[in-house]
Regions:
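Class I SAM-dependent methyltransferase SAM/SAH-binding core
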Residues: 67, 75-117
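N-terminal, positively charged/glycine-rich alpha-helical extensions of SAM-dependent methyltransferases
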Residues: 1-32
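Conserved alpha-helix/loop element of class I SAM-dependent methyltransferases that forms part
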Residues: 40-63
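A structural signal for well-ordered alpha-helical scaffolds and beta->alpha junctions
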Residues: 1-4, 42-46, 93
C-alpha cells in the first residue's frame, strides 16, 4: 500500500484522528463538542502562526494567499480563510478533501479551494 492509499483510507475511516491522534477524535467517539474542540485547536494554531509572523514582519502583516499543504479536514485552512483573501488546501486524499469541504461549508468560508496532489 502506498502512503497516498493509506491517507485515503484514513480519510474514510478516521479523518479527525488522522490529523490529531487523540482518542476523542476517533470516528466512533467523535462528539459534536469534540469536533468543535478539534476545530478550535486549528484556530489557536493559526493565531500562533500569525502572531509569530507579525513578530517578524510587523503588526500590519496580513496574508493574502495561504497554501495549506496536507490540509486534511481543513483544521488550519478554515481559520486561515478568515484571515486571507484566498486559501488553497491540498491533500493526497480525496476523502480528506471531501470532509474539508463539509467543514468549510459548515463554517461558511467561501474563499477556500482545494485539490488533490
Amino acid at each position: 500500500m502506498t502512503t497516498d492509499t493509506e491517507w485515503q483510507a484514513w480519510g474514510i475511516r478516521d479523518p479527525y484522528f488522522a490529523v490529531l491522534t487523540n482518542p476523542k477524535y476517533r470516528t466512533d467517539a467523535l462528539t459534536p463538542d469534540a469536533k468543535l474542540e478539534f476545530l478550535a485547536s486549528g484556530r489557536k494554531t493559526v493565531e500562533m502562526v500569525l502572531n509569530a509572523c507579525r513578530g517578524y514582519f510587523g503588526a500590519h502583516f496580513a496574508p493574502q494567499r495561504v497554501l495549506d499543504f496536507g490540509c486534511g479536514v481543513g483544521r488550519l485552512s478554515i481559520p486561515f480563510a478568515a484571515e486571507a483573501r484566498e486559501v488553497v488546501g491540498m491533500d493526497v486524499a480525496e476523502s480528506m478533501l471531501a470532509e474539508a469541504r463539509l467543514n468549510c461549508q459548515a463554517q461558511d468560508c467561501h474563499n477556500r479551494s482545494e485539490s488533490v496532489v
